[in-house]
Swiss-Prot record:
GO terms for biological process: L-histidine biosynthetic process. The keyword Zinc applies. Its EC number is 1.1.1.23. InterPro entries: Ald_DH/histidinol_DH, Histidinol_DH_CS, Histidinol_DH_monofunct, Hstdl_DH. Belongs to the histidinol dehydrogenase family. Substrate binds at residues 234, 256, 259, 324, 357, 411, 416. Binds 1 zinc ion per subunit. This is Histidinol dehydrogenase. The active site is at residues 323-324. Its cofactor is Zn(2+). The keyword Transit peptide does not apply. Keywords: Amino-acid biosynthesis, Histidine biosynthesis, Metal-binding, NAD, Oxidoreductase, Zinc.
Length: 431
C-alpha cells in the first residue's frame, strides 16, 4: 500500500491519486455484445441455447428452471445454510419494508388538490452472476425489494448450473421464473423477450464487462429496458483516528481487495501510527487468505492518505465518494452529519462492511466510481415509480386561471391558454 501525506501534494496531485482507473470496455466488447443482442432478438430461445453452450460450456435441458428443480435444490441445502439465508432475508425485508412511501395529498390553494402516489414497476429482471462462488446475497438484495414493492412479475437469470443457494433464495423471495441463462444474452433476453423469457421493464444486478455493456446498450434503446445504475469496480474508504483498531481496519480493507484486482481500497487517517500499524496488519492477514493473489493485485494500487485532521479526512472522503465508507473513530456518529457522498456507511469498530454485504438489512447494491454524488444505494424506490395527480374544482380553476393564462401567453402557447379560458367561459356563462 502506498502512503501519501495529503498536505504535501499539489491540488493536481491530489486529484490524480484519487482518480479511479479508466473503465475501458473496448470496441471489441461493444461489438461482441451488440452481436449477441442482435442474435437473441432475431433467434430467441435458439440463440440462448447456442450461446450458453458456447460461453458456459453447458447444454441445459430447458431455458426455464422447473419448480421440481428448485425444490430439489432446497432439499440439498443444510439447515445451517437455510437458517443463515432466512435470517438475512428477515433483516433485509424489515429494513426495506420501512421504506414504503406514504401517499401525499396537498391542497395548494382552495380548490386545487395535488397528490403523489407510488406504483410498482410491473415486470423486473434480476441478473445474478455465476462463477466459482454462488451469490445468494445478491438474490436477496434484489429479490426482497422487488417482492415488497409488489412488482407483478419478477424473473431471474443466472448462468447454469445455478447454485442451490440461489434457487433457495429465489423461492424465499417468490421469484416467478428462473432461467438458465447468463452473460449479455441473459440481459438481451430480459430486455426484449424470447419464447421462454419474459420481457421486463427494468433490469437489476451486477456482472462482468459483457453484462455491464449489455445493460448499457439495452438501456439506450427505447425498445429495451431500464437498468438499476452505472457499474464500476468495488471500493472502500476507511476514515480512522488514533483510537481505531489496526487489525479491524486491515481486515476491512482486505475484504474489499479480495473482490477483484481492480477493487479500490483507501485508508484516510490523521495518525501516522495507525497508518504504519495497518500496513503491517495487512501484510500479516494477507498471507491467510485463499484469494491472496487477487487481493494483492488490488492492494498494489491502494492508498493510505495521511490527513492533518479528521475534518480534512471527511473532506477527502466526500471528494472521493466511496461505495463503502467505514468510520472507525472515537465518536463516529459525530462525523455523520458531515458525510455527504457514500453508498453505504459503517459506523464504529463493530460494523464491518461484511455485515452490510450479507445480512444487516441494508442493500449491498451501491453506486461506485464516484456516482455516489448523484446516485443512491438500491432500495424500494428503485422498484417503484411515482405518479402525480391533480384535481381542480370549478372555483379552483377560476382562481388559478389568471396565473396559467399569463404564463401561457408569455411562452406563446395559445392552445395551453385556450384549454383554460374555454372552461372559464363556460363557467361564467352558467352564471
Amino acid at each position: 500500500m502506498r502512503t501519501v501525506v495529503w498536505q504535501s501534494l499539489s491540488e493536481t496531485q491530489q486529484d490524480a491519486i484519487l482518480e479511479r482507473p479508466a473503465i475501458t470496455e473496448g470496441a471489441n466488447i461493444t461489438a461482441a455484445v451488440a452481436e449477441v443482442i442482435a442474435k437473441v432478438r432475431a433467434e430467441g430461445d435458439a440463440a440462448l441455447f447456442e450461446l450458453t453452450e458456447k460461453f458456459d460450456r453447458v447444454k441445459p435441458e430447458s431455458i426455464r428452471v422447473t419448480e421440481q428443480e428448485i425444490e430439489e435444490a432446497s432439499a440439498r441445502l443444510t439447515a445451517k445454510m437455510k437458517q443463515a439465508l432466512e435470517q438475512a432475508y428477515a433483516n433485509i425485508a424489515k429494513f426495506h419494508n420501512a421504506q414504503k412511501p406514504t401517499p401525499i395529498k396537498v391542497e395548494t390553494q382552495p380548490g386545487v388538490v395535488c397528490e403523489q402516489v407510488t406504483r410498482p414497476i410491473q415486470k423486473v429482471g434480476l441478473y445474478i452472476p455465476g462463477g466459482s462462488a454462488p451469490l445468494p446475497s445478491t438474490v436477496l438484495m434484489l429479490g426482497v425489494p422487488a417482492q415488497i414493492a409488489g412488482c407483478r412479475k419478477v424473473v431471474l437469470c443466472s448462468p447454469p448450473p445455478i447454485a442451490d443457494e440461489i434457487l433457495y433464495v429465489a423461492k424465499l423471495c417468490n421469484i416467478d421464473e428462473v432461467y438458465n441463462v447468463g452473460g449479455g444474452q441473459a440481459v438481451a433476453a430480459m430486455a426484449y423477450g424470447t419464447e421462454s423469457v419474459t420481457k421486463v421493464d427494468k433490469i437489476f444486478g451486477p456482472g462482468n464487462a459483457y453484462v455491464t455493456e449489455a445493460k448499457r446498450q439495452v438501456s439506450n434503446d427505447f425498445r429495451g429496458a431500464a437498468i438499476d445504475m452505472p457499474a464500476g469496480p468495488s471500493e472502500v474508504l476507511v476514515i480512522a483516528d488514533e483510537t481505531a483498531d489496526a487489525d479491524f481496519i486491515a481486515a476491512d480493507l482486505l475484504s474489499q481487495a479480495e473482490h477483484g484486482p481492480d477493487s479500490q481500497v483507501v485508508l484516510v487517517t490523521p495518525s501516522v501510527l495507525i497508518a504504519d500499524q495497518v500496513t503491517d496488519a495487512v501484510q500479516k492477514q494477507l498471507k491467510q487468505l485463499s484469494r491472496a493473489s487477487i487481493a494483492e493485485k488490488a492492494l498494489a494500487s491502494s492508498l493510505i492518505i495521511i490527513a492533518d485532521s479528521l475534518t480534512q479526512a471527511v473532506s477527502i472522503s466526500n471528494y472521493y465518494g466511496p461505495e463503502h465508507l467505514i468510520v472507525q473513530t472515537k465518536n463516529p456518529r459525530e462525523l455523520l452529519p458531515l458525510l455527504d457522498n457514500a453508498g453505504s456507511i459503517f459506523l464504529g469498530d463493530w460494523s464491518p462492511e461484511s455485515a452490510g454485504d450479507y445480512a444487516s438489512g441494508t442493500n449491498h447494491v451501491l453506486p461506485t466510481y464516484g456516482y455516489t454524488r448523484t446516485y443512491s444505494s438500491l432500495g424500494l424506490a428503485d422498484f417503484s415509480k411515482r405518479m402525480t395527480i391533480q384535481e381542480l374544482s370549478a372555483e379552483g380553476l377560476k382562481t388559478l386561471a389568471p396565473t396559467v393564462v399569463t404564463m401561457a401567453e408569455a411562452e406563446g402557447l395559445d392552445a395551453h391558454k385556450r384549454a383554460v379560458t374555454i372552461r372559464v367561459e363556460k363557467l361564467n356563462a352558467r352564471g
